[in-house]
């Protein structure tokens, strides 16, 4: 769990959870346009002999690539990473291949939405808690491998992420809206993907 709370909001930290040990853990502050502070947490893992470099982030969206948080990540972290298998995921506040996320097209990462493939034009990962308006797909999982073959076999959006009807949470804001929309776990719907790694004609 990182120590930088997004935009100084209460408890908006980035985290990486893993069934396997994590090591070389760190957090990088992002110096870019948009709300501040923004950051990215990272950790390494080794899962059944497959080394992974994992990044989790929450950044402001931007209409342009220049000086955006996405460009900062692409230029300063993804491009310079020597990791064999790199994964970067989180809330990017931009649609795939739009706005600031165009910067990811230049650094060789692939999107689970393109690999599955899933048309993101008519689905959404975020519902604005006050208005109920949908933002479209602004949460993403990107990945890059150098020599190991990897296939995305399954994945999508979890639309049933709600608290139980009996749940009661203390909150100063959005209590009425939280009740109105069925007590969701978050204003963002979780996304997931299954990756199959292959090396020497064997699956992992």
Task: Give the positions of each predicted feature.
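Hydrophobic beta-strand residues in large extracellular and virion-surface proteins
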Residues: 17, 22, 52-54, 73, ...
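Active-site-proximal beta-strand/loop segments in catalytic clefts of secreted hydrolases
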Residues: 2-7, 18-20, 30, 56-60, ...
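Acidic-and-aromatic substrate-binding clefts and catalytic sites of carbohydrate-active enzymes
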Residues: 7, 33-36, 64, 92-95, ...
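His/acidic metal-ligating clusters that form di-metal
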Residues: 42-46, 51-55, 65-93, 97-102
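Structured beta-strand-rich core segments of catalytic domains in phosphoester-bond hydrolases
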Residues: 1-55
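A short, polar/proline- and glycine-enriched secondary-structure boundary/capping micro-motif
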Residues: 37, 64-68, 163-167
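Solvent-exposed, acidic/flexible segments
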Residues: 10, 66-70, 131, 135
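Metal-dependent phosphoester-hydrolase catalytic domains
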Residues: 27, 78-86, 94-204
């Amino acid at each position: 769990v990182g120590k930088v709370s997004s935009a100084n909001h209460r408890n908006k930290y980035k985290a990486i959870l893993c069934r396997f040990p994590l090591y070389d853990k760190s957090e990088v502050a992002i110096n870019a346009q948009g709300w501040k502070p923004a950051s990215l947490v990272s950790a390494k893992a080794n899962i059944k002999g497959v080394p992974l470099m994992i990044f989790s982030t929450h950044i402001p969206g931007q209409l342009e690539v220049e000086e955006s948080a996405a460009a900062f990540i692409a230029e300063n972290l993804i491009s310079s990473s020597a990791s064999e298998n790199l994964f970067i995921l989180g809330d990017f506040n931009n649609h795939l291949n739009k706005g600031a996320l165009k910067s990811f097209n230049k650094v060789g990462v692939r999107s689970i939405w393109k690999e599955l493939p899933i048309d993101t034009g008519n689905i959404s990962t975020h519902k604005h808690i006050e208005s109920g308006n949908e933002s479209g797909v602004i949460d993403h999982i990107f990945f890059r491998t150098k020599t190991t073959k990897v296939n995305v076999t399954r994945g999508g959006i979890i639309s049933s992420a709600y608290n139980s009807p009996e749940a009661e949470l203390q909150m100063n804001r959005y209590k009425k809206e939280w009740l109105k929309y069925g007590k969701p776990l978050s204003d963002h719907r979780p996304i997931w993907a299954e990756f199959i790694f292959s090396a020497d004609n064997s699956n992992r």
